[in-house]
Amino acid sequence: MEEEAETEEQQRFSYQQRLKAAVHYTVGCLCEEVALDKEMQFSKQTIAAISELTFRQCENFAKDLEMFARHAKRTTINTEDVKLLARRSNSLLKYITDKSEEIAQINLERKAQKKKKSEDGSKNSRQPAEAGVVESEN
């Protein structure tokens, strides 16, 4: 039992380290882009500090999203939780709301297309049977 818990803890730590490395890499790439665009330099310590702050903020976001869903007596985080998280940044909230509405519209269109295809399929399956009846009457 104790070995399983230790192994699980090691896996969790390893996973967290990989996530941190991915965040660090992404922050480094973004800093490089900004450095080229603005003709400035970022030290390795600055990139590391931005990476650590970003990772901690993401942890806080994850905890907040879990709490929002739990408060609503849900086990799944939804777009309303994300909007609630972004409420302090008007531009981010607007962007998320616009994207959410865009996705909802796309989903509605896909549903309508599926429904139309299924209706067309059922009409096509009826037509040959009806045609057969007409032919046999002549």
Curated annotation (Swiss-Prot):
| UniProt subunit comment | Heterodimer with CENPX, sometimes called MHF; this interaction stabilizes both partners. MHF heterodimers can assemble to form tetrameric structures. MHF also coassemble with CENPT-CENPW heterodimers at centromeres to form the tetrameric CENP-T-W-S-X complex. Forms a discrete complex with FANCM and CENPX, called FANCM-MHF; this interaction, probably mediated by direct binding between CENPS and FANCM, leads to synergistic activation of double-stranded DNA binding and strongly stimulates FANCM-mediated DNA remodeling.
Q: Name one Pfam family in it.
A: CENP-S
Q: What does this protein's UniProt record list under function?
A: DNA-binding component of the Fanconi anemia (FA) core complex. Required for the normal activation of the FA pathway, leading to monoubiquitination of the FANCI-FANCD2 complex in response to DNA damage, cellular resistance to DNA cross-linking drugs, and prevention of chromosomal breakage. In complex with CENPX (MHF heterodimer), crucial cofactor for FANCM in both binding and ATP-dependent remodeling of DNA. Stabilizes FANCM. In complex with CENPX and FANCM (but not other FANC proteins), rapidly recruited to blocked forks and promotes gene conversion at blocked replication forks.
* Taxonomic source organism: Homo sapiens
| Nucleus recorded as keyword | yes
Extract one GO molecular function annotation from the record: protein heterodimerization activity
Where, subcellularly, is it found?
A: Nucleus; Chromosome, Centromere; Chromosome, Centromere, Kinetochore
Return the GO cellular component terms, semicolon-separated: chromatin; cytosol; FANCM-MHF complex; Fanconi anaemia nuclear complex; inner kinetochore; nucleoplasm; nucleus
What is the name of the protein in this document?
Centromere protein S
Q: Record's family?
A: Belongs to the TAF9 family. CENP-S/MHF1 subfamily.
Look up the record and give one Gene Ontology term from the biological process aspect: replication fork processing
Q: Which UniProt keywords apply?
A: Acetylation, Cell cycle, Cell division, Centromere, Chromosome, DNA damage, DNA repair, DNA-binding, Kinetochore, Mitosis, Nucleus
- Please give the tissue specificity annotation from the record for this chain: Ubiquitously expressed.
Q: Which residues carry this modification: N-acetylmethionine?
A: 1
Primary residence: nucleus
Q: Where is this region: Disordered?
A: 110-138
